[in-house]
């Protein structure tokens, strides 16, 4: 066989192999590559969506956290205001109660002072009558001299 015939036969076999490969082998390979590329693209798209959703969720969480912090700060401020109001009310009531107690004590002391003065006047009047009795060596009649004794009490 000559070199030309061998070369020609190999060329024919090569083209038959190429045609067979293009017809039967190449389509499943390209289909598998296309499916793989599609899966990779879907995976990347899903990753991008997940990344976007994560960013959105993080934003919502931050907003909720800020809202909760604001609400807690507001509640704390309200509690402090209520505590101050309660303390101020207690101080006011204590001051009023103290004023009432002081007023009652002053009133009681004034009454005791008036009673003590009245008792002292009566005692002084009785002593004055006794002294006058002894000076005069006679008995002074309280009923007869009631006007004189009452004037003496008021002067003392």
Curated annotation (Swiss-Prot):
One of its GO terms (cellular component) is proton-transporting ATP synthase complex. It comes from the Bacteria. The keyword Repeat does not apply. The keyword Cell membrane applies. InterPro entries: ATP_synth_B-like_membr_sf, ATP_synth_b/b'su_bac/chlpt, ATP_synth_F0_bsu_bac, ATP_synthase_B_chain. Keywords: ATP synthesis, Cell inner membrane, Cell membrane, CF(0), Hydrogen ion transport, Ion transport, Membrane, Transmembrane, Transmembrane helix, Transport. The gene is atpF. One of its GO terms (molecular function) is proton-transporting ATP synthase activity, rotational mechanism. F(1)F(0) ATP synthase produces ATP from ADP in the presence of a proton or sodium gradient. F-type ATPases consist of two structural domains, F(1) containing the extramembraneous catalytic core and F(0) containing the membrane proton channel, linked together by a central stalk and a peripheral stalk. During catalysis, ATP synthesis in the catalytic domain of F(1) is coupled via a rotary mechanism of the central stalk subunits to proton translocation. Component of the F(0) channel, it forms part of the peripheral stalk, linking F(1) to F(0). It is a single-pass membrane protein. It is found in: Cell inner membrane. The chain crosses the membrane at residues 7-27. Belongs to the ATPase B chain family. This is ATP synthase subunit b. F-type ATPases have 2 components, F(1) - the catalytic core - and F(0) - the membrane proton channel. F(1) has five subunits: alpha(3), beta(3), gamma(1), delta(1), epsilon(1). F(0) has four main subunits: a(1), b(2) and c(10-14). The alpha and beta chains form an alternating ring which encloses part of the gamma chain. F(1) is attached to F(0) by a central stalk formed by the gamma and epsilon chains, while a peripheral stalk is formed by the delta and b chains.
């Amino acid at each position: 066989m000559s070199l030309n015939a061998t070369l020609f036969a190999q060329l024919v076999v090569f083209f038959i192999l190429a045609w067979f490969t293009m017809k039967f082998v190449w389509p499943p390979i390209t289909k598998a590559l296309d499916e793989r590329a599609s899966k990779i693209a879907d995976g990347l798209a899903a990753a991008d969506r997940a990344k976007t959703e994560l960013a959105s969720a993080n934003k919502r969480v931050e907003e909720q956290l800020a809202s909760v912090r604001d609400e807690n700060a507001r509640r704390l401020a309200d509690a402090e205001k209520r505590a101050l109001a309660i303390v101020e009310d207690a101080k006011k009531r204590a001051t009023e109660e103290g004023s009432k107690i002081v007023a009652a004590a002053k009133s009681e002391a004034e009454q005791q002072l008036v009673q003590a003065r009245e008792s002292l006047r009566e005692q002084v009047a009785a002593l004055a009558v006794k002294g006058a009795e002894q000076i005069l060596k006679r008995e002074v009649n309280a009923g007869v001299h009631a006007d004189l004794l009452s004037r003496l009490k008021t002067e003392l």
